Amino acid sequence: AEVEARPGETIWRVAQRRGIEIPHLCYSPEPGYRADGNCRACMVEIEGERVLAASCIRKPTNGMRVNTLSDRAVSARRGVFELLLADQPDREQAHEYDSTFWSWAGKLDLTNSRFPAGGAPAPDPSHPAMRVFLDACIHCNLCVRACREVQVNDVIGMAYRGHQAKIVFDFDDPMGESTCVACGECVQACPTGALMEATRVDADGVDKREPLDNVDSVCPYCGVGCQITYRTRHNRIVVVEGRNGPANEKRLCVKGRFGFDYVNHPHRLSEPLIRREDAPKDASTEIDPANPYTHFRTATWDEALDFAAAGLRRIRDRDGGRALAGFGSAKGSNEEAYLVQKLVRTGFGTNNVDHCTRLCHASSVAALLEGIGSGAVTAPFMACKDAEVIMVIGANPIENHPVAATYFKQAAQRGAKLIVIDPRGTALKRYASHMLVFRPGTDVALLNALINVIIREELYDSAYIERFTEGFENLRKRIAPFTPEAMAPICGVDAETLTAVARAYATSAASIVFWGMGISQHVHGTDNARCLIALATITGQVGRPGTGLHPLRGQNNVQGASDAGLIPMVYPDYQAVGDENVRAKFEDAWGTPLDPNAGLTVVEIMDAANAGKIKGMYVMGENPAMSDPDLQHARAALAKLEHLVVQDLFLTETAVHADVVLPASAWPEKDGTVTNTNRQVQMGRQALIVPGEARQDWWIIQEIAKRMGLKWQYTHPRDVYREMASVMPSLDNISWERLDAESSVTYPCDGPDEAGHEIVFGDGFPTASGRARLVPTEVLPPD
C-alpha cells in the first residue's frame, strides 16, 4: 500500500499510524522520549538496501519501499528477543508478567531461549516505593533517558564495561540511598519489569498479577494538574500512572505517583462527631487523632447536620449574617468551592467567605486584575518550550511544581536562558544561566532596576506600548531614580548583573516570567506583581508563543476555587459584589437578596473572631489552625467561636476546636472538576468508595444548606457544574459532557468543538480601555 509520511515522522511512526505493529523495546512513543535505535527489535527491510534498518530512527524518503514482515526482518527480531530472553527470569516468576518485553515475546511465539543464561544480579529493595531487578534489565537505556532527558534529574546512568555494564544510581549506590527523587518516570518507562512499583510485586519480587481497575482522573496535589490513572483493587490504590495530559505528558512527581496512602490512613474520619459537653474548648487543646473520643462523641448524620445548622441559624437569626463566616478549600473541586460560597452568601447572608488563596496569590490576582483585567495566567507553563528567556522569581518549582520544572530544565538544556531570582538559591540554580540571590524583601528595588535599564536604554517595544498600554510616561518618570547602581546596594545584586538580566529579558524574541509565593506573600506582594506586569508589557513579552505572565498556583485548585467565587469581594468569575447589575444577576440566579458589602478576608475573619464579632464558622477542607499567620492567634480565635463546624478527612488542628466534625471524601473518592495554573479545566473521577459513614462533600454542603432554609436539589456534581457554567462566562463552551469526553479544556474557549486559547491577550486586554495599566511602585521596607 502507498502511504504518506508526515514531516519528521519515522518509519515506526508511520506504521503505527497505519495500524501496523512493529516490536520495540528501547523506543518509547510517549512524549519527550527520543529514539535511540540500540535494541534492534524494530528492524525492517528496505528494498535496495543491504542491511536492515531500525524503524524507530529511520525516516522515510520519497519512493521508499519498506517491508515490515519480510523473513529477514522477522528473523532478526526473533533473534534479538531470543538473546534477551536467555537472561530473563522465567515468565511465571517475572517481575512484570505483562511487560512490553513479555507481550512482544508472546506475539513472536517465544517462551524460552537456546542460549545460556548469565548470572542474575541481586535485587535492590532499598527504596520504599520502588524495586530494582537488574536480572530483567536489557540495557535499553529507557530509564536513563527518562531520568536524564525527560525528568532531567540525572540520577540514573550506565556504568562499567562489557559484561559488567549495568544501570546504576549515582555512583552505583542502592536506589534508596541515591539522590533519586522518586518521580517514578523510570518505572513507567521500563519495558521489562527491571524497575517496578513496590506495591505490584510480592516479597520475592514476583508480579502479583492482580487484576486492577483503571480510573482516569487528575492529581490532587499542586497547581500543575497532571492527568493520572488510578489502578485500584479492593478499594485501595495500588498504582498511579501518568496520562498524556496537556500539563504533564504522562510525567508525574513523587506525590502524584506514590502519595495516596493517606486515603486509607487509619486516622481517617469515618463517622460524624459532636463535641462532648464535658470537653470545653481551649486554644491549647491537643487531641490524639487516633482517639478523638476523649473530646467528641459519635453521632448520626441527621443529628450532626441538624446540630451544625442549628448553631449557624441561631447566630444568623440573633446577630445577623455578618456574625458568620465560611472557609472553603483549594484542595476540593470547583463544584464544592461554588457551593460553599453560595451557601455563605445565600444561607448565611454574608460575603464573609474566603480560602487559602488569601495567603498565597491574592496579591498577584489583585495586581493582575488591576493591570491587565484578568487574574489568571496569560500563557501555560508549557510556553517555556518556545521561550528564549525564562525568568523564575520567588518560586522553587523543582520542589513545589516538579513536573512544571521538568520543562524549565529541558528548556535550559536546549539553550534557553534561565534566569532564577531568589534569596535562597533554589535547586533550579543548577540549570540557570543567571542566578540572582538578592536580599529578602528587596524585590521591588531589584525589579525596578530591571525596568529602569530597559527604559533608559530604550529596549522597550514602542509600538506595543503605544497600542496596548497606558501610563508609560508616568512610569518612565517614576522609574528614573531606580538605576541599577542605586538599587545594587539595596538588593545585594551588582549593577552589571542587573543590567545584563534586563537586556537579556528585553531583547529576546520570546521571554516569559514565572513567579511564586516568594514574592506574593509580602506586604508589598501586589507591588512585586505590578513590577512584573510592567516588565512584560513594556517589552511586548505578552500574547505570543514563548511569552507571558504566569503566577505558579500552589494547590491543585487555587485557580478554580477563586474562579468559582470563593473570595469575599467578588462573585464567581471575579464579578464584584458591589456592582448593582452584577448583584442583580446573581440574586436572580440564586433567588434571594444578597449582601451588597464586600466580606472579610481570611485574616480579617480570624481577627474578628478573636474580637467576638464573628461568632460562628463553617470550615470545609481548610486548616487555619496550621496555615494562618500567628498560629496562637488563630487557635485562640477558633476556640472563642460560639459554634464551629468543620468538614474534613482527619481530625485536623482546626477540627480540635470544632463543635461538630463532618467526615468528608478524599479526592480519589469523588467526581468533580478542577482548574489548574494553566487555566485548564479538568475532570476528576471517583475511583474509591468513601470509608465508613463518610459522605461526598457536595452532599454535606447541600444538607447544611437545606437546614439553613435553602431549597437546593442537586443530585450530582454535574448539576452544580451546569449552574456554574450559566453564571460564569469563563466556562462558555466547556460543558460537563465535553470535559468527561476530553478530560481537559482550556478557557477561554470560543466554541463547543474548538480548543481553548492557551495564550491570551495577543490583541489587547480585558480592561475598560483594552490596554494594560502600568502602575509605578516604590521601595518600601519589609514589614
Task: Enumerate the language-model features and the residues they cover.
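Active-site lining segments that contact anionic ligands and/or coordinate catalytic metals
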Residues: N153, Q164, N214-D216, G225-Q227, ...
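N-terminal export/assembly segments and adjacent metallocofactor-ligating motifs
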Residues: A1-T10, I46-G48, C56, G63-L459, ...
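N-terminal cofactor/phosphate-binding cores enriched in small/glycine residues
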Residues: V3-N62
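Non-catalytic alpha/beta scaffold blocks inside enzyme catalytic domains
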Residues: A279, L359-P545, L552-L731
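Non-catalytic terminal/interface segments that mediate subunit docking, oligomerization
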Residues: T232, E241, L252, P545, ...
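Glycine-rich loop at the start of a catalytic domain that most often binds anionic cofactors/ligands
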Residues: D36-C42, Y338-R345, D527
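Long, low-complexity segments enriched in small/aliphatic residues
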Residues: Q559-I567, K585, P717-D783
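A short, compositionally biased
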Residues: G37-C42, C222-C226, I759-F761
